[in-house]
């Protein structure tokens, strides 16, 4: 709705702007909570069996986005609680203006998720339906299209207005890392993160497996002893969980792709990964998809799986994700823009359609991380104000949920 895609910004040339850094963005006011940077109507299935119906409904409503995810595979109460936490977070995310929840059975799970989402975001238009109650998939698609159409009408007149950047929550992610990630891409994102935090905003990064070997550095940046203890604890828990099944985190990290890109050990990879969080104190450690409510820099305890980790922070309430890659990744997200940053000139040339910003000038000595970090910050604010990220323009709307426990 009113979004435009800027082709090749930061990819074809070094910008290095000198104008003042923006301290406001254009977003959508919500009746409760933070403003959004998108005005999405999402069609959210609450179980895997409702995915197709959700997709067919979304296809009939211009601008609607279906949010299918990796199968529900719930294997116990703890796992079910985690899945519900992600779905509730998605339904109450700041970029979501309205929600249609689609259930398979008439068991009330959709109503439970709607109720919890409304506790977080009172006044949000949310409708629920079940395929069983409608009398089957064909009738459900017809009824869902009517419900979704009404929701689309309810949010159609929303207009952007100015807000301070202190309202923004930026997420950071890396995937398909190579040597250039730690040398340039992640440091540039770190500069951008520091700028936003200094303007009163919030930054969250995750992927606990990729803090291993660098957790002591993050712990030294903790705002207090309890936060430092939690940082050490979540990394130790990952290794303990791997050992319990006869594996080690280092056994799968770095990946073959990481090693082909010049990374030799998990410690080397982690030292580069944590740079995307900038240099400010760590305020706390959040559980998977836990709401991000504080200011400053936060860590979230997630696996290293890119789609899962991005979705967790989106469900936690982040507005957008800045994703660094050296080997290349097309990944997007259903409820937030995912901006791609790459410092590998060969990868940028090969996959230019998938990138928003090139940090390759740092590698070639044409720019500094500080100057490019400011440019990235400006681009981030443009995306927050409506410019489409590459993944959005292409239509990458991935979403995934982490599952725990043993399948029945």
Question: What kind of feature is each model-predicted range?
Answer:
Residues 2-320, 324, 329, 333-408:
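Metallocofactor- and cofactor-centric catalytic cores in central/energy metabolism, strongly enriched
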């Amino acid at each position: 709705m009113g979004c435009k895609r800027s082709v090749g910004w930061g990819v074809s040339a070094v910008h290095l702007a000198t104008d003042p850094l923006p301290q406001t963005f254009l977003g959508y006011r919500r009746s409760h909570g933070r403003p959004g940077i998108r005005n999405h109507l999402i069609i959210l299935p609450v179980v895997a069996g409702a995915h197709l119906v959700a997709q067919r409904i979304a296809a009939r409503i211009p601008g609607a986005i279906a949010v299918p995810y990796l199968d529900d595979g719930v294997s116990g109460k703890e796992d079910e609680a985690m899945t519900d936490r992600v779905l509730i977070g998605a339904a109450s995310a700041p970029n979501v203006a309205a929600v249609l929840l689609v259930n398979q059975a008439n068991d009330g799970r959709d109503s439970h998720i709607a109720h919890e989402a409304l506790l977080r975001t009172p006044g949000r238009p949310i409708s629920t339906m079940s395929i069983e109650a409608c009398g089957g998939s064909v009738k459900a698609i017809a009824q869902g299209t009517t419900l979704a159409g009404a929701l689309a009408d309810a949010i159609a007149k929303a207009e952007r207005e100015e807000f301070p950047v202190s309202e923004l929550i930026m997420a950071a992610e890396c995937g398909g890392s190579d040597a250039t990630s730690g040398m340039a891409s992640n440091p540039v994102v770190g500069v951008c993160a520091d700028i936003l935090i200094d303007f009163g905003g919030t930054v969250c990064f995750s992927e606990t497996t990729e803090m291993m070997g660098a957790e002591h550095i993050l712990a030294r940046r903790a705002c207090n002893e309890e936060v430092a203890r939690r940082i050490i604890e979540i990394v130790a828990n990952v290794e303990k969980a791997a050992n319990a099944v006869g594996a080690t985190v280092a056994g799968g990290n770095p990946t073959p792709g990481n090693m082909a890109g010049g990374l030799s050990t998990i410690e080397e990879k982690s030292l580069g990964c944590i740079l995307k969080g900038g240099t400010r104190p760590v305020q706390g450690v959040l559980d998977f998809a836990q709401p991000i409510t504080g200011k400053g820099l936060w860590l979230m305890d997630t696996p290293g799986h890119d789609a899962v980790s991005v979705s967790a922070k989106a469900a936690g309430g982040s507005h957008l994700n800045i994703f660094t890659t050296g080997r290349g990744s097309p990944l997007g997200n259903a409820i937030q823009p995912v901006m791609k940053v790459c410092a590998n000139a060969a990868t940028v040339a090969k996959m230019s359609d998938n990138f928003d910003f090139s940090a390759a000038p740092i590698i070639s000595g044409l720019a500094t991380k500080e100057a490019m970090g400011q440019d990235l910050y400006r681009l981030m604010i443009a995306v927050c104000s409506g410019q489409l990220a590459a993944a959005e323009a292409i239509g990458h709307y991935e979403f995934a949920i982490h599952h725990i426990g043993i399948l029945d």
